[in-house]
Amino acid sequence: MDLILKALTEPQPFSWEGRYYQFRTVAVWPRPVQQPLPPVVVGTRSDDTIRYAAEHRLGLGVSFLPVDQTQAITDKYRAWCEEAGWTPGPDNIVYRGSIYLAETDELANEWFEGLTQSRPGPNIPLRRTISEAIQSARVGSTFDLRGVVAGSPEGDVVGNSLGINFLGGPDTVASQIKEFHDRCGIGVIDMPFQQNKVDHPAVMKEIELFGRTVIPQIKEF
């Protein structure tokens, strides 16, 4: 991260002799328009990186965790930001979580029940790194895709979650988003609507429904 930040801010080419990376010449051209930096968001769960983001006045990104575990991370971040002499705003905290939105809670739950009763499809995303999967194969340990989005702020992976963070009709999904906003200080959300067994027309219908029924509620937060 130090290398990236210097590359974005240093006006002249420079050499880098770090612990992990050595480069004879580093230069970014054209220069970033934003000064001193474009918005930088650090996606992390580890305490040392959370503190790094806070001390360097960088944004924080959290992905796919339940609200309780997300709050544990954002509470640390905001406390360390205060220690560093600044207060992060909502735009500094980003959350990424999967969504399935339907006209009613009943329809959303019906889809989810059908998903839980089937085996994971081939398009479930691989959120762990390939190297971890290879290492698991080498030592004969289990590598279960179904649990990759469950975990704790310390980064361990437990459970059998299918990773749908926002599920329900418009009012339910709006209230779920509001809980992340109120408890975690999150002001930016990134939600992949494409889920297992959801085709493109259904995704477009979800997005239209979200814009028509959920966004007006979010604007009132």
Each predicted region: which residue ranges?
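Short glycine/threonine-rich loop-to-helix capping motif typified by GTGT followed
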Residues: 103-107, 199-209, 219
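An alpha-helical appendage that flanks or caps ligand/catalytic pockets
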Residues: 1-29, 68-186, 219-221
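Glycine- and acidic
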Residues: 58-59, 162-163, 191-197
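A conserved active-site cap/scaffold subdomain adjacent to cofactor or substrate pockets
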Residues: 45-50, 54-66, 73-74
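A local structural motif
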Residues: 33-39
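Glycine-rich, proline-tolerant flexible connector loops at the mouths of alpha/beta enzymes
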Residues: 64-65, 192-203
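Hydrophobic faces of well-ordered beta-strands that scaffold small-molecule active sites
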Residues: 40-43, 58-62, 91-98, 187-191
